[in-house]
């Protein structure tokens, strides 16, 4: 099975949820490891190096936010947060500190499986073509984007982006100067279809994260601009240079 080599860490203090997810994800071909609290999650992560982390927000002692912050200090591993129904602040906070996506409890295991597949696909190190040559470096002023290695450099220093952040940047750069609506970004980067009712602030938070990492002045951006009433666009003219 194509998912066989992917290892997923499920972190939740509810044994029943860990059990259900371990069973379902194992059946469809993933290797699953679990942790029942935040401290254990960090220990398991550093030992097992999973491909993706499914992380509950509400846990005693070290909660999901704390775990996410610690993981982001050392890794760009994809993180999907499990948040409470109706707690919008949980979702936004999780995204702001580095989560790639979220699923609201109670959730359908099939929904989570779909989100895992989508996030892993977009976090894959093999570049998918979005109209940008995958055999070159894109130079944009002080930025260089290596589409082969999925790496970004600012003033010749590596900037660490998560897989979703890179995919979002790659999408915007692929049609520099053309605005993308939030709905189209959700569909292209996260795989959410139009009929899904998804909080578009997912896009806004990731844009803020990109600006914080790439712009000289994130509060007055000159790379990633807001297209009033539409969404976002990448402003600079780009030059393609072969590797």
From Swiss-Prot:
Pfam families: Response_reg (PF00072), Trans_reg_C (PF00486). GO terms for cellular component: chloroplast; cytosol; protein-DNA complex. The keyword Metal-binding does not apply. NCBIfam families: ResRegRpaBCyano. Residues 76-94, 135-236 bind DNA. This is Probable transcriptional regulator ycf27. Transmembrane segments: none annotated. PANTHER family: OMPR SUBFAMILY, REGULATOR OF RPOS. Residues 7-120 form the Response regulatory domain. Probable promoter-specific protein mediating the interaction between DNA and RNA polymerase. GO terms for molecular function: phosphorelay response regulator activity; transcription cis-regulatory region binding. Keywords: Chloroplast, DNA-binding, Phosphoprotein, Plastid, Transcription, Transcription regulation, Two-component regulatory system. SMART domains: REC, Trans_reg_C.
């Amino acid at each position: 099975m194509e998912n066989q080599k992917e290892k997923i860490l499920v972190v939740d203090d509810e044994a029943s949820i860990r059990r259900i997810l371990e069973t379902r994800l194992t059946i469809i071909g993933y290797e699953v490891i679990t942790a029942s609290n935040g401290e254990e999650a960090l220990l398991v992560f550093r030992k097992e190096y999973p491909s993706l982390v499914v992380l509950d927000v509400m846990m005693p002692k070290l909660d999901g936010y704390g775990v996410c912050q610690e993981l982001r200090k050392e890794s760009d591993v994809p993180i999907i947060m499990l948040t409470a129904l109706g707690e919008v602040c949980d979702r936004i906070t999780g995204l702001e500190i580095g989560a790639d996506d979220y699923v609201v409890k109670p959730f359908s295991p099939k929904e989570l499986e779909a989100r895992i597949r989508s996030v892993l696909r977009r976090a894959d190190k093999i570049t998918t073509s979005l109209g940008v040559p995958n055999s070159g470096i894109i130079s944009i002023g002080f930025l260089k984007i290596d589409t082969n290695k999925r790496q970004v450099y600012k003033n010749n220093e590596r900037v660490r982006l998560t897989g979703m952040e890179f995919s979002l940047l790659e999408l915007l750069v692929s049609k520099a100067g053309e605005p993308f609506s939030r709905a189209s970004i959700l569909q292209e980067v996260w795989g959410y279809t139009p009929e899904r009712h998804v909080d578009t602030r997912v896009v806004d938070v990731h844009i803020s994260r990109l600006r914080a990492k790439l712009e000289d002045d994130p509060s007055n951006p000159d790379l990633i601009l807001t297209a009033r009433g539409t969404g976002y666009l990448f402003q600079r003219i780009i030059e393609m240079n072969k590797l």
